[in-house]
Amino acid sequence: MIDAFFIAGTDTDVGKTVASKAILDALNMKGLRTAAYKPIAAGSEDKGDGVQNSDAIHLRSVANVELSYDEVNPYALLLPTSPHIAAAAENIVIDYSVLSKGLASLKAKSDIVLVEGAGGWRVPVSKSDCLSTWVQQEKLPVVLVVGIKLGCLSHAMLTEEAIKHDGLDIVGWVANRVNPGTEHYADIIEMLEDKMPAPKLGEIPYMPSIKRKSMGKYINLDSLMEI
């Protein structure tokens, strides 16, 4: 079984954290020791206990291995914008060795680590590099989250092409219904199933809130567990 995998999105705000929660819930239901890792998070806040990001806080609460906030999210950036802009505003340089050291530590404490990205696949972390470079270095298998909305078919296929071009395996994809009013939902899913070679791990219905809801029932991990 794999010991870590990366959650990528077709865009920002497609529901990576929603899908991550569902996958973590499903892994927890299988009795595995789970850790969540959000290496870089923008749009964080300082509420008196240090700069923290709401997505990272949520992931930390869902995974069942107890970790400090800094272990889950080593780079919590304030501005809600692209990481390279947010980091530059604070004179922070994203150091891949810090990300790798953190991941190795979580692997040692758990059976499996869910690593959630920021933005889309080619999200820049500096003027010269993207987070995908680090994912390549770590050779992480990828689960792609597709936010079901107008335009998602092109975004999904282009992202899949980019991930494969980078030499990484897409081990599954998750459909997340980000808009309850999206028309032709079934047709979109059918096209994705036809065009995406990787197995569909699940479909998550539209949810205005995911707090205190167990979402593992929406995810089938059989194919992921066989890797």
From Swiss-Prot:
Cite the InterPro entries for this sequence.
Answer: DTB_synth_BioD (IPR004472), P-loop_NTPase (IPR027417)
Q: In which pathway does it act?
A: Cofactor biosynthesis; biotin biosynthesis; biotin from 7,8-diaminononanoate: step 1/2
Q: What is its main location?
A: cytoplasm
EC numbers on record: 6.3.3.3
Residues the record lists as binding ATP: D13, V14, G15, K16, T17, V18, D55, E116, G117, A118, G119, N176, R177
Query: Where along this sequence does the record place binding of Mg(2+)?
Result: T17, D55, E116
Has keyword Transferase?
Answer: no
Q: What is the lineage of its organism?
A: Bacteria, Pseudomonadati, Pseudomonadota, Gammaproteobacteria, Vibrionales
Similarity remark: Belongs to the dethiobiotin synthetase family.
Q: Please give the subunit comment from the record.
A: Homodimer.
Name the NCBIfam families for this protein. bioD
Q: Which reaction does it catalyse?
A: (7R,8S)-7,8-diammoniononanoate + CO2 + ATP = (4R,5S)-dethiobiotin + ADP + phosphate + 3 H(+)
Q: Looking at the UniProt record for this protein, which Gene Ontology cellular component terms does it annotate, in alphabetical order?
A: cytosol
Active site at which residues? K38
Q: Name one GO molecular function term.
A: ATP binding
| Cell compartments where the protein resides | Cytoplasm
**Organism whose genome encodes this protein:** Aliivibrio salmonicida (strain LFI1238) (Vibrio salmonicida (strain LFI1238))
Q: What class of enzyme is it?
A: ligase
Q: Which UniProt keywords apply?
A: ATP-binding, Biotin biosynthesis, Cytoplasm, Ligase, Magnesium, Metal-binding, Nucleotide-binding
| Cofactor field | Mg(2+)
Q: What gene, per UniProt, encodes this protein?
A: bioD
What is a biological process (GO) this protein takes part in?
biotin biosynthetic process
Name of the protein:
ATP-dependent dethiobiotin synthetase BioD
Its biological function? Catalyzes a mechanistically unusual reaction, the ATP-dependent insertion of CO2 between the N7 and N8 nitrogen atoms of 7,8-diaminopelargonic acid (DAPA, also called 7,8-diammoniononanoate) to form a ureido ring.
